[in-house]
UniProtKB/Swiss-Prot annotation:
Present with 339 molecules/cell in log phase SD medium. Keywords: Nucleus, Phosphoprotein. This is Topoisomerase 1-associated factor 2. One of its GO terms (molecular function) is phosphatase activator activity. It comes from Saccharomyces cerevisiae (strain ATCC 204508 / S288c) (Baker's yeast). Residues 51-69, 690-709 have a biased composition (Low complexity). PANTHER family: NUCLEOLAR PROTEIN NET1-RELATED (PTHR28196:SF1). InterPro entries: Dnt1-like_N (IPR018844), Net1/Tof2 (IPR043185).
């Protein structure tokens, strides 16, 4: 079991060392000199005798040592500029370990003391210097006094008094950071035994252990909240992060460009280090000019690059430099591409793209890294590429301008144009409108316009098939660019070979921003099948129209206007093509089901409207309302009366169709009622039909049987007759329902529908005058 030693640590500055020596000399004098000390010894002896304790006599050496230690510690309390505190440690530790523990304890007890302290040596209560290899239990007794001799004075006037509550909080804050505490402890234990043994005087320990401000973990933990740690982070944290990053080779040239127009300035970073951060912490990427200065290489083309960059319409574009691998970082929305090519046509393309959202934020950005290694002085343009570019420049219309398109696909166009200007070949591009194949037919098909024809003076077909010299082809291409797109801003800079290449690159880059030809659209339309919508087909009136010279294709979604490019859900200048599909909701399905179920049934209104009329005659009767009076129990007196006579005449041409809801089952030219009682009563309804010529419309009026006497007079004057319709009783039965074709009707769940079957009613027409 480890036995802990209780020690009294006394910090003695240089000004208090002489006083301690004087006190030690006074304490070593005979005890009779001090009557007060003798009085205290008598009291201690008397108390021990009362408690029957076998304590040694006051004159024994052990008792004298304990008394003298207590006296010395009591006198030290009154020394100026001294500090005393209690410390517990293991008795088997050395004095070197004790000195490190004293420094740690001092930092914990006095956190406001900002000055660094240095321990010169450790002494016992007699003022003897001690060796650092001594064991604590061999030198000090339990509750002994350890004098810590300091190099500098302790100025306590500059430090504020700290309360116990503040001290407890400080300790809890330190306990939460064990790593910091262990680091400081290890730094203070770096003094080895060999360093101490190298001192000339081995009997005296000159322990120099500094507690500087830099290594003091108390001073490093001044920030108490996590939020302040984010606002005021330590400088060493950034140093550690920068060391973890992989440095780029010094021979590479870094070109940084940001597509967003609101970010104009490039941040600066350390040489050869490229860090990728979030949107809140912008990246520090050195520009190409700064990197060239760091490398010490002065290039003559740097002036031309700056000139062309300022005169170009794309302010963020930087042309490729020569004889050096290049790395360009472009902040482009939802695009991450890594492309590495060389002049030997070896391609490597890695692309990761996210679906573009409807609303683009200027803070959304991603990174594109393109690495290109070039071995030649000139751009790697072969003969077929030169011929292709000549065709495209000649075929380009003068009506189309080079204005930037403000849409969500503009970044991808600029991205592909830069790859074209630096000799890249896009393998898996998401836009088919930009193609850089070495095949002349494919390039011409995807880039040239249909309304212009290639002019033969520059490159006839026979000359294109032959292998042209690099310098001749590029010179002819540059002359064509100067002819088609003159630029006065170049001036004398156009005489150099590099300036000509840059001019060609700029022209090709601008040509790549426009739509493909109509032939490409037709091929895309033929390759894409018509979408199938399953159960519901496309209506004829909603089918997309075919592609015309000024139309819009449903699949390709390109427009004639070069400044209008749509993608996703955005609307273009001519609107948006939408395919309408036939949709049936629940309500319409229920209505359709009821209509099919009641297809063979007719209402009473339709029955009385068509009563006594030929089957093919045009309907001219509209029954407004039928009222039923209470029916008596007797079978002889059954009459149907209405509260008010409903009469309505309607003038309709005979050619109009019959006003029937749905065709139903008929028997002998008479319709079947839709809803009747199981045992219907006999009804008597008076129907008056007026006869007229076929050209004029006929009219029929319904009257109550009670008003028959009043209507007889009018019938005599006009050519009309009273018709009495009688309905007899009939039986009902249950069975499966059928439609007009005789097939059984099914419900939504494909089950047969059972309905009531009625016997066909018979109607008898008779004149009341005959009766």
């Amino acid at each position: 079991m480890i036995k802990m030693w209780r020690l009294q640590i006394v910090l003695v500055p240089p000004s208090a060392q002489d006083i301690i020596t004087f006190l030690e000399a006074r304490l070593n004098t005979p005890q009779s000199v001090s009557p007060m000390v003798q009085y205290n010894e008598d009291i201690i002896t008397h108390n021990n005798s009362i408690n029957n304790c076998s304590d040694p006599s006051p004159t024994s050496p052990s008792s004298q040592n304990s008394i003298q230690s207590n006296r010395s510690s009591d006198f030290i309390n009154y020394l100026p500029n001294c500090k005393k505190f209690l410390h517990f440690t293991d008795g088997d530790n050395t004095l070197l370990q004790l000195s490190n523990e004293i420094l740690t304890k001092f930092d914990r007890l006095y956190p406001n003391f900002k000055e660094s302290i240095e321990i010169v040596s450790l002494q016992d209560r007699h003022g003897c210097d001690l060796d650092s290899e001594f064991i604590i239990k061999d030198v000090f007794e339990n509750d002994g006094v350890v004098l810590v001799i300091l190099k500098d004075e302790l100025d306590w006037s500059r430090n504020q008094h700290i309360s116990l509550l503040q001290l407890a909080r400080q300790r809890r804050r330190q306990d939460n950071k064990p790593s910091t505490k262990s680091i400081v402890t290890e730094k203070r234990k770096k003094i080895s035994k060999e360093d101490l043994s190298s001192i000339s005087n081995k009997d005296t320990m000159h322990l120099i252990a500094k507690s500087s401000l830099k290594n003091n973990f108390i001073n490093k933990s001044r920030v108490s909240t996590p939020l302040m740690n984010e606002i005021l982070p330590l400088a060493s944290k950034y140093d550690a992060l920068n060391k973890e990053k992989c440095p780029m080779p010094l021979t590479s040239t870094v070109v940084a460009s940001n597509v967003h127009k609101d970010v104009k300035d490039h941040a600066r970073a350390k040489e050869g280090v490229v860090t990728q951060g979030s949107d809140n912490n912008k990246e520090n990427i050195p520009s190409s000019t700064q990197q060239q200065k760091n490398d010490g290489a002065k290039r003559a083309e740097s002036k031309d690059l700056d000139l062309l960059r300022n005169s170009s319409e794309d302010a963020d574009y930087e042309p490729a430099d020569e004889n050096s691998p290049q790395i360009s970082f472009d902040s482009i929305d939802t695009d991450f591409q890594l492309s590495t090519t060389s002049h030997t046509n070896s391609d490597m393309h890695i692309q990761y793209s996210n679906p573009s959202s409807g609303a683009h934020s200027p803070r959304k950005s991603s990174l594109e890294i393109k690495v290109q290694n070039k071995k030649g002085d000139d751009l790697p343009l072969n003969d077929k590429d030169i011929g292709e570019n000549c065709r495209r420049i000649e075929a380009f219309s003068d009506e189309e301008d080079f204005n930037e398109t403000d849409n969500d696909r503009a970044d991808s166009f600029i991205n592909n144009s830069k790859k074209a200007s630096m000799g890249f070949r896009d393998i898996n591009s998401d836009l088919d409108s930009v193609s850089f194949n070495s095949d002349i037919e494919n390039a011409v098909q995807s880039t040239q316009s249909t309304k212009n024809v290639v002019s033969p003076p520059f490159f006839p077909e026979k000359e294109l098939n032959n292998r042209l010299h690099q310098s001749q082809g590029k010179e002819a291409l540059f002359r064509l660019v100067e002819k088609e797109f003159p630029d006065k801003s170049l001036g004398a800079a156009s005489s150099t070979s590099h300036a000509k290449d840059v001019k060609i690159q700029e022209t090709i880059r601008k040509l790549n921003r426009f739509k493909p030809t109509g032939e490409t659209k037709v091929q895309k339309r033929n390759s894409i099948t018509e979408p199938y919508y399953g159960k519901f087909g496309i209506m004829k009136k909603d089918k997309p129209k075919s592609i015309t010279s000024k139309g819009v294709s449903l699949e390709t979604k390109h427009f004639d206007d070069p400044n209008t490019i749509i993608s996703g859900e955005k609307f273009a200048k001519f609107g948006k093509i939408k395919v309408k599909r036939k949709t049936d909701d629940v309500g319409s399905k229920v209505i359709e089901f009821k209509r099919k179920r009641n297809m063979g049934n007719r209402s009473l209104k339709d029955i009385f409207a068509n009563a006594g009329k030929p089957p093919n005659a045009a309907s001219t009767i509209k029954v407004v309302k039928l009222m039923r009076d209470p029916v008596d129990n007797s079978k002889d007196k059954v009459e149907a009366t209405s509260n008010s006579t409903a009469q309505e005449q309607e003038q309709v041409s005979p050619k109009l169709p019959v006003m029937n809801s749905t065709p139903g089952k008929r028997k002998n030219g008479q319709a079947i009622p839709s809803s009747l009682e199981r045992t219907p009563q006999l009804k008597k309804v008076k129907v008056t039909r007026s006869h007229s010529s076929p050209s004029s419309s006929s009219s029929m009026s319904l009257e109550s049987s009670l008003d028959s006497s009043s209507s007889d007079d009018s019938d005599d004057d006009s050519d009309s007759r009273n018709v009495q319709v009688k309905k007899i009783n009939f039986k009902t039965s249950h069975g499966p329902a059928g439609n007009s074709n005789g097939k059984p009707m099914l419900d939504v769940d494909d089950n047969e529908i059972n309905t009531k079957k009625y016997q066909t009613p018979k109607y008898v027409e008779s004149d009341e005058d005959d009766q």
